Amino acid sequence: MKGYWIRMGAFAVLIASVIGGYSLYGAPAPDSLETRRLSQFDQAIITNARQLVDDGRQIFRFDTFGDESFWGDALQLHQAIKGAKLGGVGPGLSPTAALGLGLKVDVDLLPSDLANQVRAGKVDLDDPATTVALLKLKAVVGLTGFFDNAGDLQSIGIQCALCHSTVDDSLAPGIGRRLDGWANRDLNVGAITALAPDLSSVASLLGVDQETVRQVLNSWGPGKFDASLLMDGKAFRPDGKSAATLLPPAFGLAGVNLHTWTGWGSVTYWNAFVANLEMHGKGTFFDPRLNDPTQFPIAAAAGFGNVRNDPDLITSKLGALHFYQLAIPAPRPPRASFDPQAAAQGEAIFAGKAQCARCHVPPLFTEPGWNLHTADEIGVDDFQANRSPDKRYRTAPLKGIWTHQKGGFYHDGRFLTLADVVEHYNNFFGLGLGTQEINDLVEYLKSL
């Protein structure tokens, strides 16, 4: 009987705890008022996250941050797109020419009948008027046209998606569904900018003439951009090659601290930097490091270290933009794109003999924390590193590397293949990797 009453007493305590709203372990009971309140707050978090993703996607794809005042009003780029026949200048930019420069078209923004006509080859892709029509549909990835009531193209602006989105070519080469976060290694930013009739604002900033600016822009080539040019004015490397660097992807950044090849700052820092100083939007930006007239003479003279615009069209959007970028996963490679058996062998080499994982720490495949190294530590020259505040190179995340093999590897594409990258480290660190081990390691990298 004594055991019976002990058991009944324990049962009574259990009932009382549930009625009172707490389990025996001190946590709220499943149906307690406190749990319901927590659930409501959890739901608010989920709702907020969804809203941030939706807002961030819209900003990433379509927000110019007011930069049409630069690309349209100052550079008059829209005039070169229209061409003389439509009231602009020059021959105009046809869809064929635009696609040749790496611009992409979002098939989901094309009316179904137009998409069918494109598929059937019934759309004139050699007429700049077709490009203007695509701009009216907001179908040109990363470009927004501004039209008057008569439908005349009056200005143009750019978005994040211009450089950091591509398409899946599902309708035709360069025409398909968006792939946000992918580096557009086809995009010739320099050649597109060089089309602008009036580059006087850039020439004045750099202290050169417009023809020199065009020569610099045309030296970049596809998939490259020089984000430091308007900071230090260094257009070419000491060896005479362009100082432009490869466009990096904007996916797989959750958990990654520093962004860009040389780690200027966090992802959201770089968003503010680019929106204000590269896209030339209208916002607020503060970085006193840019006040250094020795390292950043152009930026210091232009006051880029403390930018204030009223109204501010950027700052309120940085949170959602950041959240959306962190939500973009690194895409998984197609199964047929690598050898699974070799990749499995390569994984062991990555973590073991090659010691790749010391810096490219899984699952981030970069270092948690301050993920920067000096040029001497990785066996390359320091030209590009010295153009950044910390004068170092970032340990680049490796997930999704299969998506941006075009243009080469490292910040400037100096290594044409992944095998070249591995061979560089093999020689520099004296790893002693054989040919088969290098091949296996490459297959593993392609599998990430």
Regions found by a protein language model. Name each.
Residues K2-L14, V18-L448:
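Periplasmic c-type cytochrome electron-transfer domains
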